[in-house]
């Protein structure tokens, strides 16, 4: 299949993320990836500065990761985690716990950042429900954040001013404050967290996390 044929079929049958179905942006066929570079069908190399949406922080085609994947897929590619376990998952969980502060002793595996946010929200809601305080069911977060594209994650991404404003009328309502102004070029100052502290006090009986 030529690159031109591939692009034509792509435009016919693939709906890319964050792209219009009727007027999609250009797509670039990739034939290989190594380190931080993607090789296109025409031989051009480009740097993937986004690390495949932050998923390839160690680079593409990393020999250690490739070896681990080959070894694993020779045994099994995947099994459900409900009522079943296996050594790689248990070993990874133990290594993660060893890296975290005392008291964080359990690991819940999720398949994406959005799902991780969904699960975290559900954990907070379930915690307060178990404490007989189901009214604590709102999140407190900063405006203009990005936490994912699933339903619960969109609700804490500033649905009014952010990229998910189309869904604002049907998303759960949460509490938002402006992001503190300190940054890499400005140290934290007294008062930077005043709005956050005020909002926490104002809605303390309804905030889950």
Feature map (PLM): residue ranges:
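A structural motif shared across PLP-dependent enzymes of the aminotransferase-like
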Residues: 29-39, 54-71, 82-94, 155
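A short, flexible beta-alpha/helix-coil linker loop
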Residues: 52, 75-76, 181-184
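Generic structural signal for well-ordered beta-strand positions
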Residues: 46-47
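Cysteine/selenocysteine-centered motifs that mediate thiol-based redox chemistry or coordinate metal-sulfur cofactors
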Residues: 2-9, 73-108
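Active-site-adjacent loop/helix segments that line or gate small-molecule/cofactor pockets in enzymes
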Residues: 1-34, 84
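PLP-dependent aspartate aminotransferase-fold enzymes
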Residues: 94-208
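Short clusters of small/polar residues that mark proteolytic maturation junctions
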Residues: 50-51, 139
């Amino acid at each position: 299949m030529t690159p031109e044929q591939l692009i034509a079929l792509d435009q016919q049958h693939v709906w890319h993320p964050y792209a219009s179905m009727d007027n999609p942006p250009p797509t670039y066929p990739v034939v290989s990836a190594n380190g931080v570079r993607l090789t296109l069908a025409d031989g051009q190399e480009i740097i993937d500065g986004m690390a495949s949406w932050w998923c390839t922080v160690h680079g593409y085609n990393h020999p250690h990761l490739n070896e681990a994947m080959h070894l694993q897929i020779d045994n099994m590619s995947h099994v459900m985690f409900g009522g079943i376990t296996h050594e790689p998952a248990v070993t990874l969980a133990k290594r993660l716990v060893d890296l975290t502060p005392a008291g964080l002793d359990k690991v819940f595996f999720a398949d994406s950042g959005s799902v991780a946010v969904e699960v975290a929200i559900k954990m907070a809601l379930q915690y307060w429900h178990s404490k007989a305080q189901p009214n604590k069911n709102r999140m407190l977060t900063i405006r203009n954040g990005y936490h994912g594209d699933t339903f619960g994650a969109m609700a804490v991404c500033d649905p009014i001013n952010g990229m998910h404003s189309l869904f604002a009328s049907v998303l759960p309502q949460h509490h938002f404050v402006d992001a503190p102004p300190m940054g890499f070029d400005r140290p934290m100052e007294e008062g930077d967290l005043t709005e956050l502290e005020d909002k926490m006090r104002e809605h303390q009986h309804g905030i889950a996390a």
